[in-house]
C-alpha cells in the first residue's frame, strides 16, 4: 500500500526561515516547494496542486493576510500562517480571513 506524500508550499521572505521549515518537513517525508513572496507563491499555485500552504504574514509587497483571503476565495487548500505576530487579535484576524491554523515564531 502506497502512503500519500503531502506536497507543501512554504512561503516566507526570510531565506533562513524558509530553508529551516523546508529542511524539517523534508526530514519528515513531505515534498516541499518554496516561494519567496506572494507573487512567487501565486505563480506556483497556478501550476501545481499543493496539499498545504505554510504562509508568513509579514512579507514585502502583498502580505500573507491578503494572500490568504485571495487564495481562500477559490481554493480550499489548508493554510497555516507562520509569523512573529503573536497577539490574540492577529491570530483572530488570520483565522477570520480563512487560515486554518497559526504558528508563532520563534519556534523550536
Segments the model singles out, each with a brief description of its role:
Residues 18, 60, 87, 105:
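The feature encodes the CheY-like receiver
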Residues 19-27:
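Charged docking surfaces used in two-component/phosphorelay signaling
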Residues 48-54, 59:
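Active-site beta3 strand of CheY-like receiver
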Residues 29-36, 44:
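Short hydrophobic/Thr-rich beta-strand motif most characteristic of the beta2 strand and flanking loop
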Residues 37, 63-66, 90:
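Acidic catalytic/metal-coordinating carboxylates
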Residues 43, 62-76:
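Short amphipathic alpha-helix used as the core "switch/output" element in two-component signaling
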Amino acid at each position: 500500500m502506497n502512503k500519500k506524500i503531502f506536497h507543501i508550499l512554504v512561503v516566507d521572505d526570510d531565506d533562513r526561515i524558509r530553508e529551516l521549515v523546508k529542511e524539517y518537513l523534508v526530514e519528515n517525508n513531505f515534498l516541499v516547494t518554496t516561494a519567496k513572496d506572494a507573487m512567487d507563491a501565486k505563480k506556483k499555485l497556478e501550476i501545481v496542486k499543493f496539499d498545504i500552504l505554510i504562509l508568513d504574514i509579514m512579507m514585502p509587497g502583498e502580505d500573507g493576510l491578503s494572500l490568504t483571503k485571495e487564495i481562500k476565495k477559490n481554493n480550499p487548500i489548508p493554510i497555516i500562517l507562520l509569523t512573529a505576530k503573536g497577539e490574540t487579535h492577529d491570530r483572530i484576524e488570520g483565522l477570520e480571513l480563512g487560515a486554518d491554523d497559526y504558528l508563532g515564531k520563534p519556534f523550536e
